């Protein structure tokens, strides 16, 4: 009888789209097309022309997150081959990107407030039948993409998708969003689309062993890669998970914006971003600390540090429901998260609007408006989550920026007090073009770009939320400080960095008022068994 094997807990999984690290804008056809032509090609062309400039830039901490390929100036021929192959194999997406740009230009010159009907004949051929032309109430022209149809068209090709397996033993990992993943001797490249059930079977091996021959057949790997595949397997069983069975609520912080709540047999996981298991000086929860079944995964928004396919694909087999905010249907900058997850093989995707609720026993989850942090773009697929479990209430506001304090006053009048606030305070976010640049069809002025940033709340804005909801606890999170997040985050704080000084002031202000406050880092566990009496909170904003 063949020996049974588990997947090792330190197997690193990189989901790829045409060998680029997969993040939410690389999967919907329209945003994928724009990123290929206006991000990937630009980076590859630059590297081919001047590889040493890239090699020097990646050594400079100030350049972290910039458009530089991290291969030390080497492997230029492989990058050139990838570029040329992409141009050949993704000609449809290149045409789609060009058509989006041409359509935008046509509307700017031809749509002057009169009927748009005659302009349908001028729509570029790749977009005919996939867009509706519209005005807003001020007669500004735009178009609405038929996104469900695009997923069923020649513009969506799951064969673009694959997974690269390797092993990791430390938090030291290069930034991945600007460097394509090339083949290497110690990596196993699995040509699996993200909706493949084989992916679920693969990650079930983390807790359920199978014979070698079944694993090999499942992955369809050639005999020449047997030794490599065996490096990722072990006969040793992982430790069993102990679910929380107490009478109240347990929440655990896994790093960044990832928090697991367990109560009365129901589990909720917010913005899953998990570390692998290996010996390291910083204590953390990992995949080993997840329950066998996760009732609800809740996503706040579609930035790459909140929707991490590297984590989500590994836990998909555990997830009963994934809850996402509803988008502005048909806009380029706001692709549907429901369609995204459905096309990536997730079942039971629940799309909810602001103030919609999910009720499951004594658990109520309410979607709350999320302002800011999206460079003033008209993006609706962002949501804060209010979780009420019996007498307890926790508000996960993610990167919400309190640019309109009256919003929270209206919400408090409707929803009442909240026990604990979780708030991101990256108040010096990247400019508009860093994330959304490929979607823009016109050059943005530098001053305009710098003024529109992906920024969260500062101290004054955060304290207003604490005061408005009479919070007893305030936790700063989603700061990207955990070292195992370096590969997707481009922040390197010092004690003088504004997000640190602003969050320090918020924490100190809260403590002076008897409010429990902390900037979360690494791991934390809190048990909520009996609700303590509420401490009075000052009704007026304490200014920073």
Regions found by a protein language model. Name each.
Residues 2-200, 231-246, 254, 258-302, ...:
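Pre-active-site segment of Zn-dependent metallo-hydrolases
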Residues 250-253, 267-272, 364-371, 393-399:
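Active-site-proximal beta-strand elements of phosphoester/diester hydrolases
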Residues 277, 303-307, 329-332, 356-359, ...:
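Active-site environment of divalent metal-dependent phosphoester hydrolases
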Residues 285-353:
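Active-site HxH/HxHxD metal-binding segment of metal-dependent hydrolases
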Residues 310, 371-468:
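Active-site-proximal loop/helix segments of hydrolase catalytic cores
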Residues 443-444, 448-454, 458, 464-465, ...:
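Short acidic, glycine/proline-enriched helix-loop-strand junctions
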């Amino acid at each position: 009888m063949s020996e049974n094997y588990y997947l090792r807990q330190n197997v690193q999984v990189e989901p790829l789209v045409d060998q680029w690290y997969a993040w939410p804008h690389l999967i919907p056809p329209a945003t994928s097309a724009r990123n290929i032509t206006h991000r990937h090609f630009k980076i590859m062309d630059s590297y081919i022309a001047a590889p040493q400039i890239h090699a020097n830039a990646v050594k400079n901490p100030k350049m972290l997150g910039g458009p530089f390929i991290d291969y030390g100036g080497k492997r230029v021929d492989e990058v050139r081959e990838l570029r040329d192959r992409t141009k050949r194999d993704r000609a449809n997406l290149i045409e789609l990107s060009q058509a989006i740009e041409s359509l935008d230009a046509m509307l700017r010159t031809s749509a002057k407030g009169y009927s748009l009907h005659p302009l349908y004949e001028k729509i570029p051929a790749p977009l005919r039948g996939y867009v509706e032309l519209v005005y807003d109430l001020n007669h500004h022209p735009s178009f609405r993409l038929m996104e469900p149809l695009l997923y069923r068209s020649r513009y969506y090709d799951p064969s673009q998708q694959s997974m690269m397996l390797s092993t990791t033993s430390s938090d030291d990992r290069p930034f991945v969003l600007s460097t394509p993943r090339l083949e290497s001797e110690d990596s196993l490249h699995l040509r699996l689309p993200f909706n493949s059930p084989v992916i679920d079977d693969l990650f079930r091996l983390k807790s359920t062993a199978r014979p070698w021959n079944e694993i090999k057949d499942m992955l369809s790997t050639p005999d020449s890669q047997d030794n490599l595949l065996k490096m990722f397997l072990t006969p040793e069983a992982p430790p069993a998970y102990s679910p929380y069975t107490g009478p109240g609520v347990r929440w655990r912080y896994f790093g960044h914006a990832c928090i697991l709540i367990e109560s009365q047999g129901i589990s909720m996981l917010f913005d899953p971003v998990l570390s692998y298991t290996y010996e390291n000086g910083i204590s953390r929860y990992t995949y080993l600390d997840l329950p066998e079944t996760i009732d609800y995964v809740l996503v706040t928004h579609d930035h790459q540090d909140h929707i991490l396919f590297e984590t989500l694909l590994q836990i998909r087999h555990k997830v009963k429901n994934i809850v996402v905010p509803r988008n502005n249907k048909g806009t380029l900058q706001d692709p549907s998260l429901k369609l995204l997850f459905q096309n990536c093989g997730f079942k039971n995707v629940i799309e909810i609007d602001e103030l919609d609720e999910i009720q499951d026993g004594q658990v109520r989850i309410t979607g709350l408006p999320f302002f800011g942090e999206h460079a003033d773009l008209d993006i609706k697929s962002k949501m804060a989550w209010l979780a009420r479990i019996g007498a307890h209430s926790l508000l996960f506001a993610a990167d919400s920026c309190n640019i309109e304090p009256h919003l929270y006053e209206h919400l408090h009048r409707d929803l009442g007090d909240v026990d604990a606030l979780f708030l991101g305070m990256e108040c010096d976010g990247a400019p508009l073009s860093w994330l959304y640049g490929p979607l823009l069809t016109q050059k943005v002025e530098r001053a305009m770009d710098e003024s529109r940033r992906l920024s969260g709340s500062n101290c004054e804005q955060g304290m207003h939320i604490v005061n408005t909801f009479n919070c007893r606890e305030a936790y700063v999170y989603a700061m990207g400080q955990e070292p195992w997040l370096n590969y997707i985050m481009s922040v390197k704080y010092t004690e003088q960095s504004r997000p640190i000084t602003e969050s320090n002031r918020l924490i100190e202000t809260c403590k002076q008022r008897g409010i429990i406050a902390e900037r979360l880092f690494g791991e934390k566990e809190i048990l909520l068994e009996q609700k303590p009496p509420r401490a009075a909170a000052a009704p007026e904003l304490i200014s920073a």
